[in-house]
């Protein structure tokens, strides 16, 4: 019996209140998240939905306006009359030919649908166990001092035990003052980390890491320019602080390089950066074998993408989990995800268990397909 597939791509702009807007050294201020939702519905009953964020040019190097055509191009390359597992495998074979944000959109929807079809959570589909809640860090983006302090007090009051501070936006002296105030508010028991988003040269990193050592940081994320492994190694050899690679993990060659560096470094894995959940699982296995500690995290994204990342964290049990992406969003089109006691709380149910309201989105395209 032939199978027909309906593919629908939706868009929604998700907004934070002003105090929670994204502002990093790499991104600048982001007023809203430009979300995309791919919905796959087959005549055999298979159904899955996946979310990615389009306005991440500073990470993906793909203009926002090119994301929709990239997703459509990949969809038209695939044989949709094949079994979903075969489509997922074919999608992975295209990862070197199309932008990872496009493969992530398709793979996220397929993985969610496969878990739903099998009557299990995504965490179980990926080989782990589902949990109702997962501990997460929280993030203090660049903001005026009064906002920084107000949010620090709020996050600590909400029992977040891990706080990450975005630095390298203003002067380093301001960064030091903010960290001193946060440590004063948090005390010695709270984990504090910083993220420079690749803003420093090797020499600047060496000097500034030395100045940061007094704050007893859990790690410093992406201190040097992504892709400059010579600079990263110089920084790594200059400090006792753990250093984490994020933007610098752009492809398989970067994974190889960090595996060779080994346990003295940390890795930050993101679905949209690597191309989909299977790539995250594969990279996690490689880093575990190499002794590299891992954080599984995300871009700031809506609740559907955040829930998927959280289920990956459930399955893979990384050292750190960064799952604050949908915290505080005012108009998310996906419901079911909440935060309590420093944890992200997820609904039960097959797949992701969340509820997606396509009626609140803009329709980008809607196609019935057979095969390429």
Predicted features along the sequence, with ranges:
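Short, Gly/Pro- and small/polar-rich lid/capping loops
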Residues: 1-36
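Metal-dependent enolase-superfamily TIM-barrel catalytic cores that perform enediolate-based chemistry
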Residues: 124-239
């Amino acid at each position: 019996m032939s199978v027909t597939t309906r593919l629908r791509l939706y868009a929604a702009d998700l907004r934070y209140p002003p105090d929670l807007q994204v502002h990093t050294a790499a991104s600048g201020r982001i007023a809203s998240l430009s979300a995309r939702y791919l919905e796959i519905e087959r005549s055999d009953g298979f159904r899955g939905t996946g979310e990615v964020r389009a306005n991440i040019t500073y990470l993906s190097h793909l203009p926002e306006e090119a994301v929709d055509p990239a997703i459509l191009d990949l969809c038209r390359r695939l044989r949709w009359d094949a079994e979903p597992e075969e489509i997922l495998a074919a999608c992975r074979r295209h990862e070197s030919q199309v932008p990872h944000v496009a493969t992530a959109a398709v793979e996220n929807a397929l993985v969610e649908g496969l878990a739903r079809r099998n009557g299990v959570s995504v965490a179980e589909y990926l080989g782990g166990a589902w949990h109702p809640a997962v501990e997460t860090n929280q993030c203090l983006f660049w903001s005026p001092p009064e906002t920084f302090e107000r949010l620090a007090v709020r996050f600590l009051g909400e029992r977040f035990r891990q706080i990450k501070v975005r630095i390298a936006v203003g002067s380093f002296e301001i960064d030091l003052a903010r960290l001193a105030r946060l440590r004063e508010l948090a005390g010695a028991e709270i984990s504090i980390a910083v993220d420079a988003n690749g803003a420093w040269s090797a020499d600047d990193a060496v000097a500034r890491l030395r100045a940061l050592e007094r704050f007893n940081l859990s790690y410093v994320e992406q201190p040097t320019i992504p892709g400059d492994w010579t600079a990263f190694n110089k920084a790594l050899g200059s400090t006792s602080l753990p250093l984490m690679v994020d933007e610098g993990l752009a492809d398989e060659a970067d994974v190889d390089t960090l595996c060779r560096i080994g346990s003295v470094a940390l890795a930050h894995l993101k679905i949209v950066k690597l191309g989909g959940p299977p790539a995250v699982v594969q990279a996690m296995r490689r880093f575990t074998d190499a002794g590299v500690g891992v954080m599984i995290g995300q871009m700031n994204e809506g609740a559907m993408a955040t829930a998927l990342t959280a289920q990956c964290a459930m399955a893979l049990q990384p050292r750190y989990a960064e799952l604050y992406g949908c915290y505080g969003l005012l108009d998310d089109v996906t419901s079911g995800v909440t935060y309590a006691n420093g944890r992200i709380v997820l609904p039960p149910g097959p797949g992701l268990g969340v509820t997606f309201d396509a009626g609140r989105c803009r329709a980008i395209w809607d196609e019935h397909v057979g095969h390429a």
